[in-house]
Amino acid sequence: MIAVLVKGVLSPDDAELAVRAGADGIVVSNHGGRQLNHSLASLDALPAVAQRVARRVPVLLDGGIRRGTDVLMALMLGADAVLLGRPVLWGLAVAGEKGVSRVLDIVRDELRRAMALCGVRSVQEAKSQCLLIRKGEVLGDPQQAQPPLPLQAVSRL
């Protein structure tokens, strides 16, 4: 049997409907920057969607992933995995298969470095850590959060 992932989900309600209908996974994505510039950013929609499906199915993030720090942020906001598009195509255009391999190596190395700088030893650990957002809120376990003032701790899940 083939797994079916529902893509283009930005709403927790849509994610719930997809899971109830039998989706094997959710891809949080939009068409911003191509067809609809002013839609909700995938990264902004991710926490609410991930919380709604509550680990019943994998949640993937598509859109805006350019570096390892982007991957880490997505993991901390609830993604189980990310999809890479443009960076891989840029590598392909520049150096073919070797370019694609190099892009993937760079993203992996940046992810490892960002995890080390955050004191995170594994992807699973990253998913349970606190992420500080400069919009005045903290996502993650408020017991782990030690944000500098004036940020406030709020629960993510």
Residue ranges and their predicted role:
Residues 64-65, 119:
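A short glycine-centered flexible hinge/capping loop motif at secondary-structure junctions
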Residues 1-61, 68-90, 144, 157:
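Alpha/beta enzyme core
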Residues 88-89, 95-157:
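C-terminal extensions of enzymes
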